[in-house]
Each structure stands twice: as C-alpha cells, then as structure tokens.
C-alpha cells in the first residue's frame, strides 16, 4: 500500500462528511479512485444515495449559524495555519488523485492557505451600508442602515477535478465567511482533497453543520442537489454543457457558473519574444494544461512567427515530464485516458 493510500485510510477519507459525521459506502455503492499516472487504486468513496443527499440538506437547513465576524475570521486563520502545517501531506494527496506533478501540487496547497487568509481578512470588512433619505423634496432628514444576512437556504457547490483543493477552497471559504451553510460535491475523480479540507475546517472550529461533503455519481444525485427545496444558491465550476444544464434546472435559484475559457496569447511584432515564449510554454503545460486559464490559442504577428515558434519548440523540448511524484518533473499526467485523447 502506498503512503498516500495509507494516509487516506488513516484519516478515513473514504467516507463522506454529512454534518461532520463520517458516512461510509453501503453495499455495492463504492466508487474507485485511481492514481491517473500509475492506475493504482488508492481508495474508494461512497456513491451517495438520494436519502443521504436529502439528509445533508436537512441538517444544513435546520442549523442557524451564529458565528460572529471575529469567530469566522479566527476559524479561517486557524485553518490557514493547519494547511501550512500539513502542506506536504496535502500536496501528495492532490498529486496522487489528480496526477499533477508535485511542484504544482505544493503550489496549490500554498494557494489554499492564501485563500483562507484572504477570506479571514474579508470577513472583518463591514459590508453594511448607510443611505441618506433627504435627497428629494419629498425626503426627510433621516438615514437607512442595512446589513447583510446569510441566505435562508443552503448553498450547493460542485467542483471540478483540475484543482482538487483550491477549487473547493474558492467555494467553501466565501460560504464560511458569510455565515452560510453548504453541501459540496467534489469531482468523484478527486474527492479526497475536499474531504480532508473539510476536516481541517472542523479542526479549526467550524460547526460541522455548516459544511457537508457528498460523493457520488452525478447521474444519480445531481438533480437532487440542484432542485432540493432547501437550496438557495448553486455554484459550479466546470464545462459549458453542464453549466447550461444547471441553468436550465435551477429555476429561480441564484446560480454562479464558472465555465472555462478560450484564452489567447497575442504576440505582436514588438513583443519580448523570450518572455512571450516563456508564457506560451508555462501557460500550456502548467497543471498539465488542465486550467481554465491555460493558453488555448496563440495569435502571432507574421514578422516574428518563425522566431517565436523556434523558441516555443526549444522550451517545450526542455520541459520535463513523467512520474508526478518526481520533484524534478515540471508536468505529470492528465486526469484520465479520455482527457489525453481530447488533448491529442
């Protein structure tokens, strides 16, 4: 058994977190999680039933958060410190389930800590407003004060595979910062980073009812997560087709959709070609090319196209790749065979 597989077993990351409770798989309802590079089975996660999904929303909806701004900032700051303490464990977990090289995984773990710190700072900003009422001849000399309240319902969050913990952090941290409750479904391909992140937040003092992590087959549980009567907001990062499906199913619920990009690198005739070629290579290969901000098109002025192309080819040949666990490699693998064929 690999060290990561043992870490998963030791921390019971093969169980969902429903209101903080560890919920394992029922009979014949487990999803295998494979290391994309070695095809090693590093563990399983439950294939949630509709009853388990409904339980998560019921627990979240029944809980009424009472955390002060000070409380929320303290939780996020402590979680940031815990991420730093466990940074190497997190990086190896990210790398093993996603195939990202360890360099990229270490960077991602550091970014998670950053986002926690940013969230803690935002919590302390007063988001109330004051409006004067004597602005017209009908007005009176008085003022209206406003303050923001948490949603009445629950947030559904659905995250992709390409940044197993950082994408999760960008959903969960704003929810915690605003005293909301969330049911999160990470990609079934990379579930462990999300579950471990939830555990770190619980350890930092987050009431477990404020965050549940559900794993499962989207074909079985996605509609329930989109249409459950307790859902007030849906936030999704992923592909355009699924985003359109969510928008169609969500009805009058609030939705936040991040649906990829179509990012060009534009190189003009007076560009610094050394810098431009660096950006082209890094933008194409960092994170195994699996980023919404990855370079997808290069528009190069004809007068510098040949020289630019030579530089890109030269730097591509120097880009090291292979075993994601090798610290000398700059690129690991993509998430699965289907992704590799898509790239080809």
Language model regions located:
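Residue-level signal for inorganic ion chemistry
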Residues: 39, 72, 94, 116, ...
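Hydrophobic face of alpha-helices
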Residues: 57, 73-80, 91, 113, ...
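Short linear capping/connector segments at secondary-structure termini
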Residues: 93-100, 131-138, 326-332
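Rossmann-like NAD(P) dinucleotide-binding subdomain of oxidoreductase/dehydrogenase enzymes
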Residues: 128-275
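ALDH superfamily catalytic-core signature
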Residues: 241-344
């Amino acid at each position: 058994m690999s060290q990561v597989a043992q870490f998963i077993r030791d921390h019971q990351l093969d169980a969902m977190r429903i209101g903080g409770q560890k919920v394992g798989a029922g009979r014949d309802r487990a999803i295998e999680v494979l290391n994309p590079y070695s095809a090693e089975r590093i563990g399983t996660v439950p294939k949630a039933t509709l009853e388990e999904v409904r339980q998560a929303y019921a627990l979240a909806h029944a809980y009424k958060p009472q955390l002060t701004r000070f409380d929320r900032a303290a939780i996020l700051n402590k979680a940031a410190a815990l991420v730093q303490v466990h940074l190497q464990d997190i990086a190896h977990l990210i790398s093993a389930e996603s195939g990202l090289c360890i360099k990229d995984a270490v960077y991602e773990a550091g970014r998670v800590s950053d986002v926690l710190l940013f969230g803690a700072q935002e919590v302390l900003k007063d988001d109330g407003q004051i409006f004067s009422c004597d602005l017209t001849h009908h007005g009176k000399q008085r003022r209206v004060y406003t303050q923001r309240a948490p949603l009445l319902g629950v947030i559904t969050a659905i995250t992709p595979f390409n940044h197993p913990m950082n994408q999760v952090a960008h959903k969960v941290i704003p929810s915690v910062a605003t005293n909301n409750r969330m049911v999160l479904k990470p990609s079934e391909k990379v579930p462990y980073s999300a579950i471990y992140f939830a555990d770190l937040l619980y350890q930092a003092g987050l009431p477990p009812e404020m965050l549940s992590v559900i794993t499962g087959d989207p074909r079985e549980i996605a509609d329930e997560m989109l249409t459950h009567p307790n859902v007030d907001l849906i936030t999704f990062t992923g592909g355009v087709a699924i985003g359109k499906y969510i928008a169609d199913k969500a009805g009058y619920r609030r939705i936040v959709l991040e649906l990829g990009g179509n990012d060009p690198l534009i190189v003009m005739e007076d560009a610094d070609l050394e810098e431009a070629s660096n950006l082209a290579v890094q933008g194409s290969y960092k994170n195994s090319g699996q980023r919404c901000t990855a370079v997808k098109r290069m528009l190069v002025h004809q007068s510098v196209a040949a020289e630019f192309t030579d530089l890109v080819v030269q730097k591509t040949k120097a880009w090291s790749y292979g075993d994601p666990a090798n610290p000398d490699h700059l690129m690991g693998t993509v998430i699965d065979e289907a992704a590799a064929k898509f790239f080809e």
